[in-house]
Structure formats: C-alpha cells, structure tokens
C-alpha cells in the first residue's frame, strides 16, 4: 500500500466516522433530564364543548391559571382530527425532552354543525354514545411547533376492528421498556368501557402492542378515564368509577400495568357526577392536586382535591369558588397539567402575546 493511498484511506475513515457521529449512529443516546428544581410554572391543557378545540393555560403558582390565547383555541380541532373535533387532551414531557400530547378524535355535535349526516360515525345502537375510532397524536420540541398524526385504533390490529370507542388517552414513560405507554378508555361494540394499555413506537405514530386491559373493576363494573401517577415505588391509577354514579377512585400497584388493587374510598368531594381525573404535583412541595371535570353541573367546571399521602384528600372546591382561580376563561373540559420551566412558560407566553411574568 503506497503512502498516497494510505493518506486517502485515512481521510475516508475520518469522513465516515464524522458522518456516523453527526447522524447519531455512534452517538451516545442523550436523555434530557429536567428536574423539579428547574420548574417554574404550570401548563394546563383542556378543551371546550362549543369548539372542540385545544386550549392552553399557564400558571405561576399552580392556583391561578390564565389562558394563553384569551380563551380561544391554540389548535382548531378541524385541522387535526378526522371527526373535525378533539376532546380529552393529555400532555406529558417525554424522556427525550419532547412534549407529547394525545387527544380523542371525536366531535359530539358534528351532525348539528353539518359535518356529518348521522348523529355518530356509526350506529348508536351497535356502537354506543360518542362512538369513535381514532386518537390524535401531537409532538413538539418547544410547546409551540407541533406535528400531528391520527391513530386509527380500529385499523391497528384485526382484533380491534369492532371497537365502539377510544377515549381519553393518557401516557406515562415505562423506563423498563424504554417506551411511552399509552392507556385509554375502550369498549367493543356497545359493551362496557374499561381502560386498556399499549406501547407506542419511537416515532409516536403507531401502537407496537395489542392493547390489554390494565385493571378489572370488581364485579365487572364499568369505569373510564384513567390517570397513572408514580409516587415512591407505587403506581396510583385514578379512575372515574361508574359504581353507583360517576366519581373518582384509585387503584394501587407495584407495577405500571398490572396488579392494581382498588381502594374504594372516594377521592373527589363532589355531590354530583365527575370524570377525567388527573394529578399534578405542586412544585417544591409534598402536595399533589387531583383535578377533575365536574360535567354534571351547569355550567360545567373543574373540581379539585389535594393530598400529601394519597390516602386523605382535602376538597378545594371548583374554579373561582375557592383557592383555585381562572383569570380569563370559563367552562373548561377534561384537564391535564404539567410542570414547565420558567423559560418554557415565557416562550409560550411570548408566542401568544400574553403579558404574564414568571
């Protein structure tokens, strides 16, 4: 081998190695971690019945929330959903530093608005109230720029062809599987609803596993709208139980997707029906807030309970009836709340021209 060839070969090797490193093929996997000490604000996502659009609200203290777009949708449902409307938004910060959202692809007033000829997509007798087949998936690096896709649950696996609904998706990172576990309410035909879990692909566009039941309510009773929060070594599965009304209960397990045992003690403080429970932690405090949708009052509102031990819950009332406040919006539906950094909150406020300090 002559010297000229060796020099050329060396240059080629350097070029190849540089290319592999720059494309990430040899790069060490980076998992951005943002600890609670870096958090400085809260982001609430919700929707409204009158628009079936997606809304964002910010809070500095976790008590008072301000809509970023003056109570107008930040994303219109008809731009991302097959049914031209979304419901039940959920948001999480992924292990890769990206933000992930999952929403129900459903418009319950589509016929009234001339968006379809029938009350529901399919027969209400055969597939039930609010029948749908899809979920909307969103992904963003910065809470501002979003990509989206529609996951047709009924087409994902042959076993799901006859589903009656796919509602209220939520997500949690399963570190053991290195995957986002998504779980959502589902029924077959016009049968009973319960919650199923699945693992998403890396691109967050498809399910990798056939959904399985995550929890069986005693005596086969129906339940909907699950939320999983890990505290210590325990997983707390909050649900909307349909056992003698609609109210919030929890089941507890040592495992993320199995072994849940019901604690039938009610967690909400409502006299009437509520659903869509979700938990967020107060920054720097040993306190968690349970927030849920009190759909049975008019106008509907959110209700709140607070806990420090996940056994005893102190009722905080509704928005604008106690310590929890809104500054510029009302009649919200189906909430989810995450902690965000001061910089993320400021960037989001600047995007929507919201004058708010953090």
Which role does the model predict for each range below?
Residues 1-33:
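Bacterial Sec-dependent N-terminal signal peptides
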């Amino acid at each position: 081998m002559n010297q000229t060839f060796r020099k050329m070969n060396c240059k080629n090797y350097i070029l190849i190695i540089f290319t592999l490193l720059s494309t990430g093929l040899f790069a060490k996997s980076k998992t951005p971690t943002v600890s609670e000490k870096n958090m400085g604000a809260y982001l609430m996502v919700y929707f409204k019945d009158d628009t079936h659009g997606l809304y964002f609200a910010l809070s500095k203290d976790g008590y008072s929330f301000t809509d970023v777009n003056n109570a107008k949708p930040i994303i219109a449902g008809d731009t991302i959903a097959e049914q031209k409307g979304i419901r039940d938004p959920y948001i999480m910060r992924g292990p890769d530093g990206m933000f992930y959202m999952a929403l129900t692809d459903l418009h319950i007033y589509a016929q009234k608005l001339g968006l379809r000829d029938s009350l529901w997509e399919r027969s209400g007798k055969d597939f039930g109230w609010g029948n749908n087949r899809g979920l909307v998936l969103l992904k963003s690096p910065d809470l501002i720029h979003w990509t989206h896709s529609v996951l047709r649950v009924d087409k994902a696996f042959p076993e799901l062809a006859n589903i009656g609904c796919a509602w209220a998706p939520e997500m949690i990172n399963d570190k053991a599987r290195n995957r986002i576990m998504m779980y959502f309410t589902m029924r077959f035909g016009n049968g009973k609803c319960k919650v199923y879990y699945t693992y998403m692909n890396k691109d967050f566009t498809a399910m990798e596993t056939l959904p399985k039941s995550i929890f069986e309510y005693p005596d086969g009773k129906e339940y909907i709208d699950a939320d999983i929060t890990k505290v210590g070594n325990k997983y707390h599965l909050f649900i909307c139980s349909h056992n003698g009304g609609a109210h919030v209960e929890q089941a507890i397990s040592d495992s993320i997707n199995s072994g849940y045992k019901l604690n039938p003690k009610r967690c909400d403080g409502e006299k009437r029906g509520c659903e869509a429970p979700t938990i967020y932690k107060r920054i720097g405090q040993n306190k968690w807030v349970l927030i849920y949708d009190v759909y049975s009052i008019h106008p509907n509102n959110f209700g709140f309970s607070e806990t420090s031990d996940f056994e005893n819950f102190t009722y905080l009332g509704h928005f604008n009836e106690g310590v929890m406040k809104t500054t510029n919006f009302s009649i919200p539906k189906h909430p989810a709340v995450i902690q965000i950094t001061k910089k993320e909150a400021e960037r989001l406020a600047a995007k929507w021209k919201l004058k708010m300090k953090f």
